[in-house]
Amino acid sequence: MMPFDIRVGQGYDVHALVPGRKLILGGVEIPHDRGLLGHSDADALLHAVTDALFGAAALGDIGRHFPDTDAQFAGADSRVLLREAARRVREAGYEIGNVDATVIAQAPKLAPHIGAMVANLAEDLGIARGRCNVKAKTNEKLGFEGRQEGIVAQAAVLLWRASVGDAQD
């Protein structure tokens, strides 16, 4: 038995850019002529982090907990979903160590908004800002991201808990 149960989770999300929607990433509304299409607010960054949390705790994925077939999640604020995911992960006995995420978008430039995204992640997860990181990358005009047809987000999280027995409980 290890003295600590340490878990790593990986999350991924992608949404199409379409006219007539707000662009929300990391809980921040970003000025742009298009937004992300989805059942909720389509915040790809928070969805990737949420998926990484559930994965690390072996609790399934975002679709299992917040299905896009459930009307109660139509237009949902992804910050609310992230806070609930963090609550469920803690309920399972885990603490959140850190989060590292990457958003891949050709446009708009995301660098001016990274600080606000990190602040939202830290607040929603109940951890220090220094334990949250968000990076923005372009796809060098390659693929659907480069053609500005959509935005991708990837996230990794570290969870831990002091082991008192089998991690399969």
UniProtKB/Swiss-Prot annotation:
EC class (word): lyase
Keyword RNA-binding part of the UniProt annotation: no
Pathway(s) annotated for this protein in UniProt: Isoprenoid biosynthesis; isopentenyl diphosphate biosynthesis via DXP pathway; isopentenyl diphosphate from 1-deoxy-D-xylulose 5-phosphate: step 4/6
PROSITE patterns documented for this protein: ISPF (PS01350)
UniProt: a divalent metal cation binding residues: 13, 15, 47
Required cofactor names: a divalent metal cation
Function: Involved in the biosynthesis of isopentenyl diphosphate (IPP) and dimethylallyl diphosphate (DMAPP), two major building blocks of isoprenoid compounds. Catalyzes the conversion of 4-diphosphocytidyl-2-C-methyl-D-erythritol 2-phosphate (CDP-ME2P) to 2-C-methyl-D-erythritol 2,4-cyclodiphosphate (ME-CPP) with a corresponding release of cytidine 5-monophosphate (CMP).
Pfam families per the UniProt record, alphabetical: YgbB
Phylogenetic placement of the source organism: Bacteria, Pseudomonadati, Pseudomonadota, Betaproteobacteria, Burkholderiales
NCBIfam families: ispF
Catalytic activity: 4-CDP-2-C-methyl-D-erythritol 2-phosphate = 2-C-methyl-D-erythritol 2,4-cyclic diphosphate + CMP
Subunit record text: Homotrimer.
SUPFAM superfamilies: IpsF-like (SSF69765)
EC number per UniProt: 4.6.1.12
Site (Transition state stabilizer): 39, 138
Residue positions binding 4-CDP-2-C-methyl-D-erythritol 2-phosphate: 13-15, 39-40, 61-63, 66-70, 144, 147
GO MF, any single term: metal ion binding
InterPro entries attached to this UniProt entry: MECDP_synthase (IPR003526), MECDP_synthase_CS (IPR020555), MECDP_synthase_sf (IPR036571)
PANTHER family, A to Z: 2-C-METHYL-D-ERYTHRITOL 2,4-CYCLODIPHOSPHATE SYNTHASE, CHLOROPLASTIC
Cofactor note: Binds 1 divalent metal cation per subunit.
GO biological process: isopentenyl diphosphate biosynthetic process, methylerythritol 4-phosphate pathway; terpenoid biosynthetic process
Entry's family note: Belongs to the IspF family.
Keywords assigned by UniProt, alphabetized: Isoprene biosynthesis, Lyase, Metal-binding
Protein name: 2-C-methyl-D-erythritol 2,4-cyclodiphosphate synthase
